[in-house]
Amino acid sequence: MGALPCPAHIEHHQGLSSFGTRRVLRQSVACGAHRSRRRSLWAGASPGAPKYDEGALSCSFQLGSASLHVSEVRGSRHATPRAPPTGGCIELPKTLALTEEQDQRAARATSQLLNAISRCAAGSPLARLLTGPHGAASATGAGSHSSSAGAPTPTPRPDIAAAAALLPSLTWRWVSVADLEGGWVDRGVAHLLREALLVQKAASDVNASVSELVGWCMDNCSAPAAALAALWGQQQGAALPARSRSFYGLLLQRLDGGGASSAVAAAAGRQPHEHQQERSSAEAYGLSPALVFCSSVARTALSTSSRRGGRSSSSEEDGDAHDDRSHPHTQQLLEQDGSEPLVGAAASPSSNGKRSAAGPSAGADVILVGELPGDVLLDESVGNVRRQQPHANGSGAKHNGVNGSGKSGSGGAKVAHAHVNGSAADTDPGQAALGVKGSAESPLEQPAPAAKRSAAGKASRPAALLLKRPSRSAAPPAPTLPDGAEADGFASDGSGLPGHGQQQLSAIAAAAAASSLLAGPAAPMSFLETLSDDDDEARRAASLLNGAGMSDPASASSTSTSSNSGTSNLVGRVFVPMRLVSVSRFPLRDALGRPLPDGLAVPPTGPIVLSNDARVFPGTEGLLSDYATPAGDKLAVRLEYITDRSYAYGDVALQLFNISRVTRKRTDNCQMLVNGKPVNVGDPGVPLVPGDEIRFGASAAFAFRLEALPEAPSGLEAAVQQLQLHADSSSSNGNGSGSSSSSGLPQVSEEEVAAAAADMASLSNMSRRDPPRAEALLRRLLAARPGDAALWLIWAQMAARVEGPGPGQAKARMLFRAAADAARRMPVLPPPPLALQMAARRATGAGRRRRRGASTTASMDGDDGALSVADGSSSADAAIDPASGASPSAAAGPPAPSARPRHNWLLVQALGNWGKHEWRLRMYGSARHLFRAAADEAARHSGGLAAGGGGAVMHYWGSRELEAGNVRNARIVAAEALRKCPADVALYVLAASVELEASNLELAKGYCQRAYALDRTDKQLFLIWPRVEAGLGDRDKARLLFERALDAHPLNTKIINMYARFEAEEGSYREAAELYDRALQIDPLSPGPGVHNRADWASMETDLGNTGLARQLLEEGLEAHPNSAALLVVYSKLQRLEGRYQEALAAVRRAQAVAGAFNAAVMNERAQVLRALGERELAANLSRHVSAVKQLNRMKQQGYWGSEAWRAFVEATRTPEQRTLVAAARAHRLQLGWAPAVRGAKPGPPPGVVAGDGRRPAAPETQQWMALEELRRQRAEARRLTAQRTARLRAEEAAAAAGGGEAGAAAAAAALAMGSTGSMGSMDGDEGYDDEIQDPVMYGADLGSGPLPRRRLEDQDADYYEEPESMALPPLDAVRRPMPDADDM
C-alpha cells in the first residue's frame, strides 16, 4: 500500500497556540490500537495565530503544493524556509484537554520525527517510502534554492506528515483509534496510523522472535506505516526496552534494503557548514563534537555519578539532588532519535543542570557510545586533540592504549587510536595505522573512493565507543609512538599515511575527538566494536579505532593471536572491567582464607561467588568471615557479566544476584543492599557500575565497592600465577625429575612427560585412573606450554570430578576459565579426532541421507571438525591429532589472519564442560550463559550448529532443564535445537520427553515417530515411546515396543526397569518381579540403575506385603549406598508399615538431608511417619508443604515460567490458614525440643522426650495394617489345610491304583510327598514359578568359575503375586495411604 493522499483543505499548525494543542513524550511504548482502550478528553486547537516561545518548533505543510516548513529556534538543523501556507487548519474535537507540558513535549517529539524523515538520504528506500514524488519535487526545489551543491532535503508526504503529527498522541494513548473517526482526520491517514500502531504492538510482543515479528509486519502492514513506526521507535532511544530497540533497528534495516540507516547516510553527505552549525550548537552545551548513534546504550552517555547515589565521596555531596533527566542536554540526548548525529557527554556532578564550558567533563565515568559513519569527518575535532591534551607531571598527554594527534587549520586529518585493554582487532592484510602501545604496525590498504563505497551500499557500519575513567588518582602511562614519529603528531598534510585523505580517516578523527573528551588525569579509553566478520570496510575502520596498526604480516598475525582474552569473549560488546574492594573492617579472602588486599577482579567470562560458607556454596572464590553472623544465615552473592541478547548489539552489564539460603522465609537476614536499595533472594540481577556499594546481611557487616580497572583480567594469566606454574618450570629446568613432591604430588620423569605430551588420550585416561600423577604431568606440561587449551581442559575436568567443595571447586572453575581463555588465543587449531567427526556427521544426518563415500577427515584449519558431546563422553583427550600426535602449541608458525578458522571446537568443548560444572554446583544462571556461549561458538562452523557440535550442548542443556522440572525452558531449548539440527535423533527424543512431561501425548508421539524414522534402535527412544503409548491407552503397543527394545538392547537395565514399572502398574506383579530380578543380576549395585531397580522392586514388594524380600533388597542396597534417598524413603515406608516408627523417622530424616525439603516423595513419607506417631500438628504442616510443592511442580509442567510458579508457591504459603498451621507446628516442635527457642541456635531436645509420647498409641493406618496382616495369616492357614487334604486324597488314589501292599504304600508316600510341595501343598500358598535364567551369559551375568548367582526370588514369594480368591480387602492405596481427616487439619 502506498502513501495515501490527504484532503487538500487540511493544514496542520503545530506549536504553542493561544489555546495550546498539548501532547507529551512517553518514555515507554504501550500500544493503544483497540477501541476498548480508555479514551482521554481533548481540547481543540483554535486556528488562531500561533505564538512561539524560545525553543519552540513550528511544522506546517500545504497539501496542495506539498511544501514543508520546519524551523527551530534553538538547534543546529534548519530546513529551507518556505512561504507560510494558507488555508484551513485541522479542527480537533473540543472534548480534548491536555496540559501545557504535554503540549510542549508533543510538539518537540513531532518535530524530531519530521526531522528524521527529512534527513533520509535522497534516493534511499526510506526516502522513496516517506517522501515519494512530492518529496522529490520539493527536494529538487530546495536544492536549487540552497547554496553550494549539497544533497537535496527530502520532504515528507502530506499524509505521512499528518500521521507523524498524530502518532505521538496515539502512542501515548491520549487518543484512541476510535477518536480518529468523525471526519476530522482523513481516512487514509487514519488507516496509516492504525497500521503504525499495529507495528508498535508487535514490537512489544514477547511470544515470538524479533525476526518473526519483523517479517509479520512486513507482510501485513504497508511499507510507509512500518517505516513511520520504525523511525518513531528509533527516536525513543533509551526509553524503550532492549528488545523493542532491536525490533525497530531490524525493521529499519529491512525497509532500507539491508543497508545502513539512511539517516546516517544523510549525515555523511552533509556539507561542512552544516557540521559547523552542529558544532556551534554542541559547544553551547559544553560538548566536544562526536557522533552518537547506538541508542540502546545512550544511557551510558549520562554521568554515572548522578545516575546512582552514594557511589563515591564526590557524588555523596550531591546525593540525589540532581538527576540525569534534569539536565537540558541530557534530556535532549534521551529524546533524540537514535539515527540523528547527536552530541552527548556526561554532566559533571557539580554542574547541577547548568551549562558548562566547552571541554571534557571532569566528573564523567562513562562519556559516550555511538555508531561512527564511515564517511563522516569531524575535522574540527581533530584539532582539539593537541589543544585539550593534558600535561600530567610536566610531560605530554598520557592515555592507556589511546593516542591521538593532529593539527587544526590545515584541514588534514590526524591519526588516533583506541586500544582495547591491550589487544587489537583483526584487520585485513595490508592495513596500517599509527602505532599504539601493545600493538604492531603494517602498511595501510588503499581504500576505495567514497562514491564507489556509496554505490556498494556501505555508508556506515555499527560501532560502539566507550570511554571510561576507572581511577581518579592513578596517572595513565604515556602513549607509544612509532619510530620516526614526532611527539606532537604527524604532519598536517597526512604524510604519515600516504594516499589517505580526510574523508578516509573519519573514524580516526572521531576517535581523536572522543579521546579529547577524556583529557585529564587517568583517562584511558576502551573501544569495542560490534561488526560482522564479512564487513570489510567496517572492520577496516574499527581496526583503526582498536589500535590494530601493524608493521608487517608476521607481526599482524602474532598480535591478533595474542590478544587479551578478557575482551575476546566480549568482542562486539561494551563492558567496563571492574573489581570488588572491601570497605569494611572485615577483609575479603580467597578460597583458601588468604586476604585479598587488592580486591577481587570480576572476570569477563563466567561467574564469581562470594559467600560465608564454602561447604554450602561450592565454588566459593571469595570468603566472607566476620565471626558475628548468626548460625544458619548462609550469605552468598554471584557476580557475572550478562549480555542482553534481546538487543542486536548486545548490551553487557555486570549484574549481582543474591543466592543466599533462606530458612523459614527469614529474608531479612539474607538481604543485600546496593546503594541502599534492598536486593532479596530470587530478585532479578541488579546491574552495577563503578562506584556502587554493596552491603551484606541485616547488620551490613560486609561492605564492598566496585572500582573500574584499566583492562579486563586474563583467566590464563591468573591461573598460571595462582598455580605457580612458573616455579614448576624453573625447578624442572634445574632438576630433571621436577619438584612435584614438594606439593604432595608424585615425582614424574622426563620420559613420562614426553610420553604424555605425545599421547593426549593416555593422559586423559590417567586423569581418571591416577589423578595425582596426572596433575603432576599436567603441571610440567603447562609450565612449558601454558597456551595449550587441551591440557587446561583435561585438568579442569579432572578437578571437577575429584575435588571437594570449597577451594577444590573454585580451582576447577579457575581451570575452566583458563581453558576457555587459552582456546581463544590458540593460533592453530588441531583437527578434531575421527570419533568427534563421525558424531558430528551423525548429528547432521550425513551418514543416512548423504553420500556414503564422503570424506570424514578434517582440514587443518578445523572448519570441518566438530564436537560431538559436551559431557563426559567427549573430554579434552581429543585435543591432539591422533595421527600425528602434535600439540596445538607445537604448530610450525602462526598462520595468516585470514586462515584462522571461524569455528573453535576446543572452545565449544571448554564452554560446554564448564557449563556442566556450574550446573552441578547449582549455579544454573551461569550454566545457561555458558551453554549459550558454547552453542554460539558451534554455530560459527561452516556446516551450522550441528556440524560444530552444538547439538550435544543443546541436548545436555535441555535435559538438565527437564530434570529440574523447567518444562518451558526445556521446550524452548529443544525447539531451537531442532530448528538448527533437524537430523539429530537425540533432540527428537528430548522433545518427546518434554511433551510427555507436559502431558502433550499426541505431540510426543509425533516426535517419537520422527526419531524412529531416523534411527530404529535408539535406546533413549525406547525409554520414552512405550510410556507415550501407555498414556494414550494402547497397552499392547507399549508392551510390543518394550519387547523390541529388549531384543535390540538386552543388557540395558534402564529399559528393563521401565518395563518392570509398566507391568507393575498393569497388575502383572509376577512379570514385574522377573524383570526386576533380571535387571539386578545384570547390574546389582551401581549407584544409578541398580539403586532405582532395588528401590522400585522393594516398594512393590512392600505394597504386596512381602516384607522379607523387600528388607533384603533394601539392606543390601543401603550397605553399598547408605545415602541413597530413594532407598531410604522405601526403607522408612517399610519400617512404618511394620510399626517401627522411630526407625522410620530416622531413615526419612536422613533422606531429607540428602534430597532436600522440596522432594515431594521424601516430605510425604515424613508426614506419614509423623501421622503414624500421632503428631497431628507436624503432619498437617508437612502435608500443607507437600501440597504446595506438588502445585509448584504442576505449574512448571504446565508451561509456566519458574518465577511464576515460585511466586504462586510463596503466595500459597502466606495465607492465614497456613500461618496458623506453621505456628501450631512450631509450638509443638519447641515442646519436643526439635526446634531452638532462639532462631539460628542448635536445638537441644530435653532428655526422655520422644515423638509420640503421651499420644494415641496406634494411628488408624497402623490398625488397618494389623487387620490386613491377620487376614493374610488366615488365608495362608486355609490354603495349608486345603493342600493337606488334597494331598491325602491323591495318596489314597495312588494306593488304590497300585493295588495295595507294599507297592501301594510306597506310591501313596510318594504322592503325599509330592503333594506337600505341589501347587496347593506349600506352607505359604500357591506353587512357585520357574524363574531360572536359561542362559545367564546372554544377560551379561559374570558367572566366573563358581556357582550361579544367588537367586533373588524364592518359591514362597509367589503367594504375593497371585490371589485366586478375593478376601474382600480394600485397595492397597486406601489402606497404606489414608487421607488426613478433620482431626489432622
Curated annotation (Swiss-Prot):
Residues 271-281, 1374-1385 have a biased composition (Basic and acidic residues). It holds the Pfam family TPR_16. Part of 2 complexes of about 600 and less than 2000 kDa, both of which also contain non-polysomal RNA. This is PsbD mRNA maturation factor Nac2, chloroplastic. Residues 1356-1365 have a biased composition (Acidic residues). GO terms for molecular function: mRNA binding. The lineage of its organism: Eukaryota, Viridiplantae, Chlorophyta, core chlorophytes, Chlorophyceae. TPR repeats lie at residues 851-884, 951-984, 985-1018, 1019-1052, 1053-1086, 1091-1124, 1125-1158, 1160-1193, 1205-1238. The keyword Metal-binding does not apply. GO terms for biological process: mRNA processing. It is found in: Plastid, Chloroplast stroma. Residues 132-157, 263-282, 304-360, 387-502, 546-568, 726-756, 840-899, 1237-1257, 1333-1385 are annotated as: Disordered. GO terms for cellular component: chloroplast stroma.
